[in-house]
C-alpha cells in the first residue's frame, strides 16, 4: 500500500469526519443552529474533500505502483467505483455552501448527483469488485462463463448510474 501509515491515518480521519458531515444536507432547515451550519455543514464538509482526496490519491498511487496491471473484472469495477465517488464527493461539497444549499435543498440535486451516484455507482461497484474477487474463492474456482455479460453489467451499471445522477441533478437545478 502506497504511504501505508498516511493511508491508515487518512482512513481514521475520514471515519471521524464522516460522523459529522451529515448536516450539509440540512443547511436550509431552520431547526439547525447557525453554529452547527457553519462548523459541521460547511467547514467539516469542506475538510471532507481533503480526506476523500487523500484516500483517492493513495488508492490510485497503490494501483500505479502495482503496474503492469491486468484489467481484470474486479479492477474494472473498482475503478468504476472510484469514478462514482470522484463524481459524488464534489456534489456533496457544493451542498456545503449555505447560499447554494438554499436553492438546491429539497430538490432532485441532493438525491441525484450526490447520494445516488455515491451509493449506486461508488459503493455498489466497489462491492461488485469484491464479489468478482470472492466468487471464485467461495465456489472452489468456478469461472465466469461470459466475459461479454460481465462487460454489459459493468457498462450498463456505470453509464446508467452516472446518467441517472446527471439527469436528476439537471432536474434539481431546474427546481424539481
Go through each PLM region and give its residues.
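Hydrophobic cores of alpha-helical transmembrane segments in multi-pass integral membrane proteins
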Residues: 1-27, 41-62, 76-99, 111-139, ...
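Catalytic-face loop-and-helix region of soluble metabolic enzyme cores
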Residues: 142
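Generic recognition of flexible, low-complexity loop/linker segments
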Residues: 46, 66-67, 107
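Membrane-interface helix caps and helix-loop-helix hairpins in membrane proteins
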Residues: 26-36
